[in-house]
């Protein structure tokens, strides 16, 4: 991808959904946008007003007739001259329009995320807002949408910029003490006040990092694993939760040999539920592999549902894992004893207990996520840089035996780490990673 600041090409791409569709939107950005209008529409429409025009190839043939909007620089998404062409969403129409645009000098198809990258390069957004937009596009549940909107609205940027300014101000006091210690207008030692302020900032960042775990769960989803002996009803429960036949149900033991996963939306929280191979001793090589995978998935789970057939002999055994485990008695319609052993009793034949279990799963997910604050770290990149910030702050606070010059340098490094989160300093090496997450038309 082009280096920041060297965007001389005009880029274009289909920014709407898959074809065919009712309407297709082609987006354009760059210095040749006005030339594109003059060539294809023989006119430049009034800025920010929809105009109904005929779009033509260079030889004058009509391609389509539709709406177009012109957004002159710098007041556009990318900060460059931008345009949108709204066409009928037929494949032939869109392909012809893209082909005509590609023939124009200085115009080329956009790379993934290039519109957003240009917006970043032109100061229209910082990296956290760009990441929030990527999450908003990828959001599949209401909770994910709300979290992405908080980030895309700039809440993170405001918080990190405020913290960075506090570090810069604190460093300025230390350097003033170094440079003007003999001047009368510099208070006596301000160091103690600075270290107290940095200690308070450190605690704020630590609390902020702790909230990131919940945000990560909301962004990436909670993981629930169903385990139990063969024929305990694991696949039947998965099919109920999925609302469709995902797993094969059979009286033959060992039918499920690999992991089967479905995604649920429980109160706006994404929850991934995995059915696993029945846990038992077996000589089957394939089944052993399935059991090993089941145990590996259990180790990564947020919650394990351990199922046992209530109608048979009671032999409840729970695998030793860190995740919270619920004992679920199945086939409740067939009766059984020792009902106090199980947290829930269910029957996929009659539906008994299933809605109660589903409600409990949603309550578990909501309790795990909790109340998401206005600004939370949503990427591991953020958390790593925040931890690096804390490390430098700690060095500054605890360096009583160090010269003030070195402690001021720790403060400078801390502010740099915060600046890397928003993209204010030294982030070129991660830009390709971030913007490659977008689709071509964004």
UniProtKB/Swiss-Prot annotation:
Belongs to the TRAFAC class TrmE-Era-EngA-EngB-Septin-like GTPase superfamily. TrmE GTPase family. This is tRNA modification GTPase MnmE. Homodimer. Heterotetramer of two MnmE and two MnmG subunits. GTP binds at residues 231-236, 250-256, 275-278. One of its GO terms (molecular function) is metal ion binding. Its cofactor is K(+). Its EC number is 3.6.-.-. Exhibits a very high intrinsic GTPase hydrolysis rate. Involved in the addition of a carboxymethylaminomethyl (cmnm) group at the wobble position (U34) of certain tRNAs, forming tRNA-cmnm(5)s(2)U34. Binds 1 potassium ion per subunit. Pfam families: MMR_HSR1, MnmE_helical, TrmE_N. GO terms for cellular component: cytoplasm. Mg(2+) binds at residues 235, 256. InterPro entries: G_TrmE, GTP-bd, GTP-bd_TrmE_N, GTPase_MnmE, MnmE_dom2, MnmE_helical, P-loop_NTPase, Small_GTP-bd. (6S)-5-formyl-5,6,7,8-tetrahydrofolate binds at residues 27, 84, 124, 442.
